Amino acid sequence: MTSAQICIMIAIIVYLIGMIYIGFRCSKKNNSTDDFYLGGRKLGPFVTAMSAEASDMSSWLLMGLPGVAYLTGISDAGWTAIGLAVGTYINWLIVAKRIRRYTHTCNNSITIPSFFSNRYRDEKKMLQVIAAIFIVIFFIPYTASGFAACGKLFSSLFGVNYLTAMIISAIVIVAYTTLGGFLAASTTDFIQSIIMSVALIVVLIFGVETAGGIGAVIHNASKLPGYLSMTLSYDVNTGKAAPYSALTIVSTAAWGLGYFGMPHILLRFMAIEDEKKLKLSRRVATIWVVISLFVAVFIGVIGYTMSKVGALEMLTGSNSETIIVKISALLSQHGVIFALLAGVILAGILASTMSTSDSQLLAASSAVSSDILGAFRKDSSNKNGSMAAARITLLVISVVAAFIARNPNSSVFAIVSFAWAGFGAAFGPVVLFSLFWKRTNKWGALAGMVCGGSMVFIWKYLIRPLGGIWNIYELLPAFLIACVAIVIVSLLTPKPSKKIEEEFDRVAQMK
């Protein structure tokens, strides 16, 4: 092992030990499942903002997004980033405060499925169980992609066996999440967002300098047809510019719709201690997201120029997702300090993965232990039993995710894209209508959830392959169909009870 690799290893080990320590400290504050899954609703504004965005921006921020920009230019990555930035702001603006109030009013709901059940007085728990099933369906492979990303990182850096690296990474994530629950996940996510920011800044500065300056970056990138255009895309196969139609732009920007249905992000809104500070959280979150997304896309362009001038090898296919890893390896060759900085960058990649994986594990765990098992558990007063069930469920889900992640060849961006569409379509419309349309009833919510979730599969595997006008991101049509289903079914079935309507009015009138 070289001195540079040793420095990188030291930085990463210090980071990992810190995460486990936080989990241990937070474990002492968990006295109930409310604490374990929602931190007792005690998050401050900065932790709420940064943990929400860190859990949102998974490894694709430092791997997938720069990789797409490196290969095809700024159009695909750019419109995705714009959709996400707009979606982030709107989610904080219209959903955050209302869902914080409503979940607290609705029998102190601590999960999204339990909120649906309490919101519509669903005594048979149909909404709760079906929502929980969708969470497990989409989150287990999503978590597996995070484990796989960690394994790939260590394997490529140190030449260790992929499976060994993946399992060790999974153990660390599971350790602090199982110990500390939501509070540990949120605290570590806050720290991880800072590390991710440092990683982006260092790579940006070093990359521009190595590429020969901003002018050289723009000059080299502009030589590729359509590479720097928002209405064209560079086609790797033909070497020519390909049209980026208005339909494709709308389809790509539709990523922003996914935010309304992301359980691990919505939980942060539910957990803030003082709803009056959500405005501050919104500003912090939006600024961080806009800057991070812009820098991530630009790093992809910088990486191409670095390859063009011979500083890096030319990357093809999924290897383009390792562009920041390659830049870090180059940085580490400039001495001990730079090697430690490279370690921080790589810890940032690790952080981007871990910050999402821990939140996903908690959401999937709560879906099984609290929403599925809890729906059939008669005695809910046994706090120790509930906590034990929560931790055991988290461990079982982690083992399943690790089993799926044993294959190192899966695409991080593709898995994230599909899971994002699944949650956005299954839950997004139901969340919005539950919060803002009084006439919505449980049958409409159920129809929207089932239609949205199932249409993601139907569109992706049966309709989208037809090409042409059908080749759009599955989230957009599935989201719209779910909205239509909610309205039609709600209007065709009895309206909500007077008690439900009065509760809706009470929440809506809160100042």
Where is each model-derived feature located?
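Membrane-embedded helix-loop-helix hairpins and adjacent transmembrane boundary segments
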Residues: M1-K511
